[in-house]
Swiss-Prot record:
Highest taxon of source: Bacteria
Keywords, alphabetical: ATP-binding, Cytoplasm, Fatty acid biosynthesis, Fatty acid metabolism, Lipid biosynthesis, Lipid metabolism, Metal-binding, Nucleotide-binding, Transferase, Zinc, Zinc-finger
Keyword Repeat: no
Role: Component of the acetyl coenzyme A carboxylase (ACC) complex. Biotin carboxylase (BC) catalyzes the carboxylation of biotin on its carrier protein (BCCP) and then the CO(2) group is transferred by the transcarboxylase to acetyl-CoA to form malonyl-CoA.
Protein name, as recorded: Acetyl-coenzyme A carboxylase carboxyl transferase subunit beta
Gene that encodes the chain: accD
Source taxonomy: Bacteria, Pseudomonadati, Pseudomonadota, Gammaproteobacteria, Pseudomonadales
């Protein structure tokens, strides 16, 4: 190749490499179900539900509460509580290092957020699990925040709603995490004695100690479409029983068909339908529907 051609082409190639237009990170998202490539701002308008196949994608706990609660009058409960590595637990990593990494990734102190507020002007206390924080696992702080949220509901004489998304008990806290199953179940028994409603909303996924305790103790148990719900995962069960499981086993539709849950409600309808349900359970006037907030209000 002649020198003049090299001199001409090389600078041109280098300029094109350095001058490539930069696309903001996270602008496009691939649906994990149908693999459609979706424009992130448009996806936010549908509350992270794929407009092509209606797959309900996982959303973080704060977005979940932003979608559900009225904008005014929210108050976070027990936000000051932080997990402590009392057992000095270590597997492939130190527990305190796992906590630090999860806190940095999510911006949360632990895997449950609780708030008091209103939904369509109906007073409520709401909790949401943060699955990105160590798989939404339930340790001492998750259990304590849930109990404090229930106590606020008892004090205010209002219902409790919990959006679960969890892999179960947090193994790094050993028996301390298992205690939370009894602890959360006990406070829900108090709510039942006081005649205060508890609605459990199961989102993808709900497993282990959470599904074996608070998640399945709702006066009404609701799930999002196609959420995975169970105690052990399908693969573990298949390996144990050495049989092929039925189609759709552990999906919310399968559980509804077999009477394990009461309702399946699409995400876009959760706010209005739960508000009406809460009002009916307390014999309050039917709430007036307002426009559904988006994930990024």
């Amino acid at each position: 190749m002649s020198n003049w051609l090299v001199d001409k082409l090389i600078p041109s190639i280098m300029r094109s490499e350095t001058q490539k237009s930069s696309v903001p990170e996270g602008l496009w998202h691939k649906c994990p179900s149908c693999e459609a490539v979706l424009y992130r701002p448009e996806l936010e308008k549908t509350l992270d539900v794929c407009p092509k196949c209606h797959h309900h994608m996982r959303i973080d706990a704060r977005t979940r509460l932003d979608i559900f609660l009225d904008a005014d009058g929210r108050e976070e409960i027990a936000a000051e509580l932080e997990p402590v590595d009392r057992l000095k637990f270590r597997d492939s990593k130190k527990y305190k290092d796992r906590l630090s990494a999860a806190q940095k990734q999510t911006g949360e102190k632990d895997a449950l957020i609780a708030m008091s507020g209103k939904v369509l002007n109906v007073p409520v206390v709401a909790c949401a699990f943060e699955f990105s924080f160590m798989g939404g696992s339930m340790g001492a702080i998750v259990g304590e925040r849930f109990v404090r949220a229930a106590n606020v509901a008892l004090e205010k004489r209002c219902p409790l709603v919990c959006f679960s998304a969890s892999g179960g008990a947090r193994m790094q806290e050993a028996l301390i995490s298992l205690m939370q199953m009894a602890k959360t179940s006990a406070v829900l028994a108090r709510m039942r004695e006081e005649g205060l409603p508890f609605i459990s909303v199961l989102t993808d996924p709900v497993y282990g100690g959470v599904s074996a305790s608070l998640a399945m103790l709702g006066d009404v148990i609701v799930a999002e479409p196609k959420a995975l719900i169970g105690f052990a995962g399908p693969r573990v069960i298949e390996q144990t029983v050495r049989e092929k499981l039925p189609e759709g086993f552990q999906r919310s539709e399968f559980l509804l068909e077999h009477g394990a849950i009461d309702l399946i409600i699409p995400r876009a309808e959760l706010r209005s339908r739960l508000a009406r349900l809460l009002a009916q359970m307390q014999k309050l006037p039917t709430p007036v529907e307002t426009s559904q907030v988006t994930a990024k209000a």
